[in-house]
């Protein structure tokens, strides 16, 4: 690892982080090698003009035109003429692609990066100077403590009767923007953008006095997830037009959207937009926190500017978060052991992002045993083990077609890790099935996977490409999918639920290590070639 990364980590260590727990990398490798929805369910919305959820429709060319017209009328209602999409110039795609290709070519070479720095050094220095000016001493700004369910298996609820209470409206908008709704019409147009645009429409007098900065932040977050960055900028402008003061969360989201938008070919660097937002932060008295510094670092397009920013960060005692150090480590070509030793040396606490990075590294090294040992070591005393980190291991097993590893990890994540599977977890089981291939018990395992998903999704079965591939494999071999009997389903479930990792941990060669579970592996069709056709 280069010197500047060590300097950043040393600066972080000087600040001190209480209640930090460390793991010995040698131990990990050694052991391994050996009430929120209450208001949403209101049946009717009164006095809003949105009593029902709009009819969904197929996403056709006519529908795209309708969407553009809706956005145009929305912007015209603000009374402002500075919105770009009110007078959209022709997008010069070839020019953007040419600039993007030249930028990528320059980034490949040291000489090219120096050229990029010379081209943009004035803007880079202005960005850094404004960051330094906006940085306040003392404690870091805490994140907003708002909790929403990530997945909801229900139809989108109608707008509740908020009765001039911004709290109810704010909660409803928060759920729509932060929760993924899975309903019967998932192949049709999502009605949520229509509802959100109507609720915050400039001419909607019933919600005008109830709108808050948090509501606009939620919409910026939502449309940022959908990569609709133009809408994000427009809601930021509307927020200012309606005299709602932006806060630190607003600018975190805007800088994050800038970072995600860099993946799309552009005709210019993002520096002018960065300076614009930093100027607005100064205007509204919003300080720059650790996340703003981190986003600015990643928005810089070459290493000279990044090194300069890190040096100023250390020099002026700017806030440094553990996740920022993790994001730098993610760009380096180092293995998991080096990351663990680095984290221990500089007292970097284990966070969910650091854990996901370590699990990803271990899976790329095909060290599934080490990954499972790391998960079990952390789950007993910390809350950093999440469904997302387990899904990384599950995905690695599914990529290899190891249905045996996937199913035993799926069963064990609930029992040993105390982690609840999500929709992606179940979809990875179907992926492992499809990659594993068809066998005589394939249909039984398929019905078990469907049954397991329904237990976690309120009885809904949400198809994806992998479940449909499994279904087509059954139809190709059997002609149709035969509905399971209750007796057979209970028998299959009883057998498969016995498959869990015990104190021995995960083993890639589980057929030899877990001989008592060979009946489970046979049911899954995960039999080593040397044992196929044998009874042992």
Curated annotation (Swiss-Prot):
Record localization: Mitochondrion inner membrane
Entry keywords, A to Z: Membrane, Mitochondrion, Mitochondrion inner membrane, Repeat
Taxonomic superkingdom: Eukaryota
UniProt key word Repeat: yes
Name the record gives this protein: ATPase expression protein 3
Bilayer topology annotation: Peripheral membrane protein
GO-annotated cellular components: mitochondrial inner membrane
Record function comment: Required for respiration.
Residues in PPR repeats: 212-246, 386-421
PANTHER family per the UniProt record, alphabetical: PENTATRICOPEPTIDE REPEAT-CONTAINING PROTEIN 4, MITOCHONDRIAL-RELATED, RESPIRATORY COMPLEX I CHAPERONE (CIA84), PUTATIVE (AFU_ORTHOLOGUE AFUA_2G06020)-RELATED
InterPro entries cross-referenced by the UniProt entry: TPR-like_helical_dom_sf
């Amino acid at each position: 690892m280069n010197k500047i990364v060590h300097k950043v980590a040393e600066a972080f260590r000087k600040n001190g982080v209480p209640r930090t727990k460390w793991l010995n990398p040698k131990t990990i490798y050694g052991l391994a090698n050996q009430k929120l929805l209450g208001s949403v369910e209101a049946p009717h919305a009164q006095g809003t003009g949105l009593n029902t959820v709009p009819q969904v429709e197929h996403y056709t060319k006519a529908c795209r035109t309708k969407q553009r017209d809706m956005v145009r009328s929305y912007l015209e209602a603000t009374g402002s003429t500075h919105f770009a999409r009110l007078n959209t110039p022709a997008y010069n795609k070839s020019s953007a692609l040419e600039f993007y290709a030249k930028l990528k070519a320059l980034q490949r070479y040291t000489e090219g990066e120096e050229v990029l720095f010379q081209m943009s050094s004035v803007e880079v220095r202005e960005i850094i100077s404004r960051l330094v000016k906006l940085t306040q001493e003392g404690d870091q700004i805490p994140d907003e403590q708002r909790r929403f369910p990530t997945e909801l298996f229900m139809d989108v609820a109608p707008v509740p009767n908020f009765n001039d209470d911004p709290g109810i409206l704010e909660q409803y908008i928060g759920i729509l923007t932060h929760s993924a709704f899975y309903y019967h019409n998932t192949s049709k147009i999502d009605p949520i953008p229509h509802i959100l645009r109507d609720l915050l429409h400039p001419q909607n007098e019933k919600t005008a006095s109830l709108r808050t900065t948090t509501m606009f932040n939620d919409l910026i977050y939502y449309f940022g997830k959908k990569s609709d960055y133009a809408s994000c900028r427009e809601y930021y402008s509307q927020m200012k037009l309606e005299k709602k003061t932006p806060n630190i969360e607003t600018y975190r989201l805007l800088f994050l959207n800038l970072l995600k938008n860099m993946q799309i070919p552009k005709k210019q660097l993002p520096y002018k937009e960065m300076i614009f937002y930093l100027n607005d932060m100064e205007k509204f008295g919003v300080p720059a926190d650790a996340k703003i510094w981190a986003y600015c670092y990643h928005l810089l397009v070459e290493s000279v500017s990044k090194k300069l920013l890190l040096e100023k960060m250390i020099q002026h005692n700017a806030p440094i978060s553990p996740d920022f150090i993790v994001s730098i480590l993610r760009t380096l070509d180092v293995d998991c052991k080096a990351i663990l030793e680095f984290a221990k040396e500089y007292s970097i606490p284990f966070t969910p992002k650091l854990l996901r990075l370590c699990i990803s590294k271990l899976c790329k090294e095909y060290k599934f045993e080490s990954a499972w040992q790391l998960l079990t070591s952390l789950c007993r005393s910390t809350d950093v083990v999440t469904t997302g980190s387990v899904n990384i291991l599950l995905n690695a097993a599914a990529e290899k077609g190891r249905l045996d590893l996937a199913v035993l990890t799926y069963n064990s994540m609930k029992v040993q890790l105390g982690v609840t599977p999500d929709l992606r977890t179940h979809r990875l089981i179907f992926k492992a099935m499809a990659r594993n291939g068809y066998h005589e018990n394939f249909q039984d395992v398929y019905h078990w996977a469907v049954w397991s998903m329904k237990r976690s999704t309120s009885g809904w079965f949400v198809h994806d490409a992998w479940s449909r591939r499994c279904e087509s494999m059954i139809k190709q071999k059997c002609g149709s999918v035969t509905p399971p009997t209750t007796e057979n389903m209970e028998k299959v479930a009883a057998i498969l639920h016995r498959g869990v990792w015990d104190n021995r941990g995960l083993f890639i060669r589980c057929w030899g290590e877990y001989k008592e579970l060979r009946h489970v592996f046979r049911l899954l069709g995960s039999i080593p070639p040397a044992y196929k056709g044998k009874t042992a």
